[in-house]
UniProtKB/Swiss-Prot annotation:
Inducing factors: Its expression is increased by bacterial challenge.
Protein name according to UniProt: Defensin MGD-1
Modified residues (Cysteine amide): C38
Source taxonomy: Eukaryota, Metazoa, Spiralia, Lophotrochozoa, Mollusca
KW Secreted (keyword) present: yes
Membership in a protein family: Belongs to the invertebrate defensin family. Type 2 subfamily.
Source species of the chain: Mytilus galloprovincialis
Gene Ontology CC terms: extracellular region
Modified residues (3-hydroxytryptophan): W28
Length: 60
């Protein structure tokens, strides 16, 4: 599920998505891969990938 709890695999997964520069594992037991847009501003985090259903949930 998008590599979490391994930050490196999550980051690589996010970089493969157009418009995303990376990602990190967070949430309960670090099982959620959160991707961020290029620019690195915290409020630009948009897509959250959950290891349980592997679907993107739009935050906005």
């Amino acid at each position: 599920g998008f590599g979490c709890p391994n930050n490196y695999q999550c980051h690589r997964h996010c970089k493969s998505i157009p418009g995303r520069c990376g990602g990190y594992c967070g949430g309960w037991h670090r099982l959620r891969c959160t991707c961020y847009r290029c620019g690195g501003r915290r409020e630009d985090v948009e897509d959250i990938f959950d290891i349980f259903d592997n679907e993107a949930a739009d935050r906005f």
